Curated annotation (Swiss-Prot):
Places the protein is found: Plastid, Chloroplast thylakoid lumen
UniProt GO BP: photosystem II repair; proteolysis
PDZ domain boundaries: 336-433
Taxonomic source organism: Arabidopsis thaliana
Pfam families referenced in this protein's UniProt entry, alphabetically: PDZ_2 (PF13180), Trypsin_2 (PF13365)
Family: Belongs to the peptidase S1C family.
Protein name as annotated: Protease Do-like 8, chloroplastic
Catalytic machinery residues: 171, 214, 292
Length: 448
């Protein structure tokens, strides 16, 4: 229904009053309790100011029943569509809003928790001992003299001492090592973080590498003031559950810190070089590509391992990380620096592969196949496997223990002997037929 009233805003000028304007005034007066009986709606000529007589016009023109209907409609509209009419009231006048009215309260940062502060200190102290290593391949330039460096990958390393020795993984510079470089050849580029936050780049020259333990040593000609050697701790006393920190350059993001705990000890690490490394440290600290060669630290900031691998089915850090224990690093690195290789202790005899030993019903121990003549093993009295007069196989000695350390198979014997040095004397417990014997033998340098 639409109610229209003609009125004059000026003398002799007719205007029409819209429904919304009329409704607004009517509702205002009704809410004040004005009740007047009215004649039927009609067009009324307004001769006075419409602003002052609009209410009187509406009261006289609109019956009480109609007013109640209009009021009810307005009330229901406000209930079901409040945002249409009340948004301005809720939001206020934006023209008078200030920054202080809408800004949240800002609280000061405050001091760090003790655990946070300790981790921050450990990182700030050791981050300068961590370097970024880029493996490079030198290739001849076409139609030009000289060579060009082709970056192959990147990893991490640690400053070993103030003389410029850098320890990293074998596989970090594996592409360069596949060319069989000589000691002193450039096999990578090393970035060292200075105290002012600037990365200094140096040539990484090969000192020595050990594929069996996935370790390598480089040398950089950097000023001693730039070199911050890392402190090496003992890994023999580690406990599962203690906190550890890993620093490295995952995915090229230099000097990244991850925190976790030691989740396992004495693990066999299947390294990227394809060899098995015993005694590994297992951790849940995230170790990604680029972390290899970086340090694993204990809660005191001491090096307890060199990060080397991650077991994952996704190719990311959502898996289990492994580190070469510092006890192994302390044994290998000094030899690489002194001899450019590792002098491994061994017996220098030929042992039967485990599948062959199993076929010969040797279920426990390492079966001796051959013993070189005039060797220390022959002098100690070890017997090889041979054939009898009838062509039957006569089993040689079976090594079942080294200094009371049980030997289950050939791989176990190699792992045990790797703990000794050249010249050490050990006692071998062997089975010879139905006899149990003990033989003393001096370990010699393992032949390649």
């Amino acid at each position: 229904m639409q109610v229209i009233a003609s009125f004059c805003s000026k003398p002799n000028e007719n205007e029409f009053v819209g429904r919304r304007q009329l409704l607004s005034s009517v509702c205002s007066k009704i809410s004040q309790g004005d009740v007047v009986s009215h004649p039927p709606v009609s067009s009324v000529k307004v001769t006075q100011d419409w602003k002052s007589n609009l209410h009187e016009l509406a009261v006289k023109s609109v019956p009480s029943t109609t007013r109640r209907i209009l009021l009810t409609s307005l009330f229901m509209n406000l209930c079901f569509n409040p945002s249409r009419y009340l948004s301005a009231l809720a939001l206020g006048d934006p023209s008078v809003a200030t920054v202080e009215d809408v800004s949240p309260t800002v609280f000061p940062a405050g001091p760090l928790f003790p655990t946070e502060g300790r981790i921050v200190q450990l990182f700030e102290k050791n981050t300068y001992s961590v370097v970024n290593i880029f493996d490079v391949t030198l290739r001849p330039q076409l139609k030009m003299t000289g060579v060009v460096e082709i970056p192959e990958g990147n990893g991490s390393g640690v400053v070993w001492d103030g003389q410029g020795y850098i320890v990293t993984n074998y596989h970090v510079i594996g592409n360069a090592l596949s060319r069989n470089p000589s000691p002193g050849d450039v096999v990578g580029r090393v970035n060292i973080l200075a105290s002012d936050g600037v990365q200094k780049n140096f040539e990484g020259k090969l000192v020595g590498a050990d594929r069996a333990k996935d370790l390598a040593v480089l040398k950089v000609d950097a000023p001693e003031t730039l070199l911050k050697p890392i402190k090496v701790g003992q890994s023999n006393s580690l406990k599962v559950g203690q906190q550890c920190l890993a620093i490295g350059n995952p995915f090229g993001f230099d000097h990244t810190l991850t925190v976790g705990v030691i989740s396992g000890l004495n693990r066999d690490i299947f390294s990227q070089t394809g060899v098995t490394i015993g005694g590994g440290i297992q951790t849940d600290a995230a170790i990604n590509p680029g972390n290899s060669g970086g340090p694993l630290l204990d809660s005191k900031g001491n090096l307890i391992g060199i990060n080397t691998a991650i077991f994952t089915q996704t190719g990311t850090s959502a898996g289990v990380g492994f580190a070469i224990p510092s006890s192994t690093v302390l044994k290998i690195v000094p030899q690489l620096i002194q001899f450019s290789k590792v002098l491994r202790a061994g017996i220098n005899i030929e042992l039967a592969p485990d599948p062959v030993a199993n076929q010969l019903n040797v279920r426990n121990g390492a079966l001796v196949l051959q013993v070189p003549g005039k060797s220390l093993a022959e002098k100690a009295g070890l017997h090889p496997t041979s054939r009898g007069f009838a062509g039957n196989i006569v089993l040689g000695d079976i090594i079942v223990a080294v200094d009371d350390k049980p030997v289950k198979n050939k791989a176990e014997l190699m792992k045990i002997l790797d703990e000794y040095s050249v010249g050490d004397k050990v006692t071998l417990k062997i089975k010879r037929g139905n006899e149990d014997l003990e033989l003393k033998i001096s370990l010699e340098e393992k032949s390649s």
